[in-house]
């Protein structure tokens, strides 16, 4: 089985080096400054539009980071991964671009749009009953078929990939007083927060989780990785069944605070992003916005705040249903 690297930490040289290598494979996604975002007048909001990334989310960065590091034998054997949807899409996309066979394990409740994207990109899809069963299945595939396991939110290569997002964002945006970033298993936040603190130690890093899937909150409270039981949230792509040591440690080191948002706040933020920015987002993508206009509104008033829009792998019917239109 793949041994996750728990000793190496991303530094600016490694992050910049990977950014250069990824240029032909992933997009440099734009930022958009909005000084008249209606619910937070006087706050300058810098939106990072990672929802325009190849494969629809930030996950492509970690996927390419892992796959580009494989040797010829590993490429020939193929890759596997486990995901509620977006990581599987990212791995399937990267594997297609690099000519590597992919078998992805997804939870059976995954969005049909995400399952269809994986198949469109040429991956074999295996559906599992729940998150823990999915992890058990992917480790069996890894062991029996010799495929390389691309972890969805842990390990040096995955986190180095997401660190390129933070590096790119601050280069584009310039000085920010704070950044707000969604958290599921912690891989996105581990990378982004590492890059932000290396480049701008004074910038406040705030993580956001759904109330019904707060694995990192629980990890911070207990002082280490946790396993989750039953979870409930419309932000299905943030419902990690557990946290892992590597990504937890980086979040613990670099994240200044965590907040939670409710499903109703997510729905309101989705509508807000559609009404004011004309963006159709999945619930996970709206978490940072929900926090900005909710619990963080007074604290961040008058400041320049970065808001990460991390992905939008949804479909029209699901989007309409969340907004009460379907």
UniProtKB/Swiss-Prot annotation:
A GO molecular function for this record? threonine deaminase activity
Source organism per UniProt = Ralstonia pickettii
Subunit structure as annotated in this protein's UniProt entry: Monomer.
GO-annotated biological processes:
isoleucine biosynthetic process; L-serine catabolic process; threonine catabolic process
The organism's lineage is: Bacteria, Pseudomonadati, Pseudomonadota, Betaproteobacteria, Burkholderiales
According to UniProt, the reaction catalysed is: L-threo-3-phenylserine = 3-phenylpyruvate + NH4(+)
What controls how active this protein is? Answer: Inhibited by phenylhydrazine, hydroxylamine, p-chloromercuribenzoate, and HgCl(2).
Q: What is this protein called?
A: Phenylserine dehydratase
- Pfam families the UniProt entry points to: PALP (PF00291)
The record's SUPFAM superfamilies line, in alphabetical order, gives: Tryptophan synthase beta subunit-like PLP-dependent enzymes (SSF53686)
What cystine linkages occur within this chain? none
According to the UniProt entry, what is the EC number of this protein?
A: 4.2.1.-
Any idea which UniProt keywords this protein has? Lyase, Pyridoxal phosphate
Q: How does activity depend on pH?
A: Optimum pH is 7.5.
